[in-house]
């Protein structure tokens, strides 16, 4: 049964502050918590706010652990478009989190299934994800879990759809440079998080957002599985919320 808390905001800065409030509550309650993190432009105001709050003495990341949702296959950690580099430049390098307490899937792993199993074990050893940050793709994908005929459970390799590659080509010089595959947490891993915070902006996401939370639960819209999560907070702007209940 869906337990959805909707917070509507007007600006990216408001979204960052609202999302940071959710993370701050978890970190203050559990200083060694596990954050599930995401990349892209939407989380940037959140990451800026988290950095500012630690600098102001409101937060302490020294015991916090983090596990990222996904990584491109074939990109080295220092590649300009790797998600590891994104996290370093936009969050990790600016807070007190320990390097050994941050994990991102290894896009260069020789044995990807083995790496994926080790990734799951690490999250399990940490006690699971306490708060998971998510966005949503135009086709309803979460992480890189693309529409398909089943809900993938564990961390795994996935072939990226043309729609996803097209959406991400703005970060690369051309579509030919966009990787064709990625490693992503599975739907089961995401659903095991104790709390989920989804951040969404833009009128172009209004239709899929309504499908995710109020349409049929189907692997053809991977995010629709969130209807079965016990604690989801959706933070979105008015444009994205256009089709959500008032």
Predicted regions and their residues:
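A glycine-rich beta-strand to alpha-helix segment
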Residues: 33, 42, 46, 122-149
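A glycine- and small-aliphatic-rich helix-loop capping segment at beta-alpha/alpha-beta transitions
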Residues: 48-60, 83-85, 147-156, 217
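Short beta-strand segments
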Residues: 36-40, 68, 105-106, 133-136, ...
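Ligand-binding beta-strand-loop-alpha-helix segment within the catalytic cores
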Residues: 1-3, 59-132
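Glycine-rich N-terminal segment of FAD-binding domains in flavoprotein oxidoreductases
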Residues: 29-55
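Class I SAM-dependent methyltransferase SAM-binding "motif I" and its flanking Rossmann-like core
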Residues: 143-187
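N-terminal glycine-/serine-/threonine-rich phosphate-binding loop
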Residues: 1-35
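ATP/nucleoside-binding phosphotransfer catalytic cores, i.e., glycine-rich phosphate-binding loops
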Residues: 188, 192-246
């Amino acid at each position: 049964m869906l337990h959805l808390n909707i917070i509507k905001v007007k600006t990216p800065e408001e979204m960052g502050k609202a999302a940071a409030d959710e993370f701050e509550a978890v970190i203050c309650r559990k200083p060694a918590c596990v954050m599930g993190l995401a990349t892209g432009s939407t989380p940037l105001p959140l990451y800026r706010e988290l950095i500012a709050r630690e600098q102001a003495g409101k937060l302490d990341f020294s015991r916090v652990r983090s596990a990222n949702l996904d990584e491109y296959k074939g990109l080295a950690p220092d590649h300009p478009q790797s998600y590891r580099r994104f996290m370093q430049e936009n969050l990790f390098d600016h807070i007190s989190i320990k390097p050994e307490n941050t994990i991102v899937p290894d896009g260069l792993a020789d044995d990807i299934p083995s790496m994926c199993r080790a990734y799951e074990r690490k999250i399990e050893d940490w006690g699971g994800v306490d708060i998971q940050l998510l966005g949503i793709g135009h086709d309803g994908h979460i992480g890189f879990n693309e529409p398909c005929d089943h809900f993938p459970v564990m961390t795994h390799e996935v072939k990226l759809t043309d729609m996803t590659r097209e959406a991400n080509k703005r970060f690369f010089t051309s579509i030919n440079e966009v990787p064709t595959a990625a490693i992503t947490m599975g739907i089961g891993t995401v659903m095991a998080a104790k709390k989920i915070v989804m951040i969404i902006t833009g009128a172009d996401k209004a239709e899929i957002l309504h499908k995710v939370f109020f349409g049929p639960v189907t692997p053809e819209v991977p995010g629709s599985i969130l209807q079965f999560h016990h604690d989801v907070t959706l933070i979105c702007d008015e444009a994205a919320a256009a089709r959500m209940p008032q």
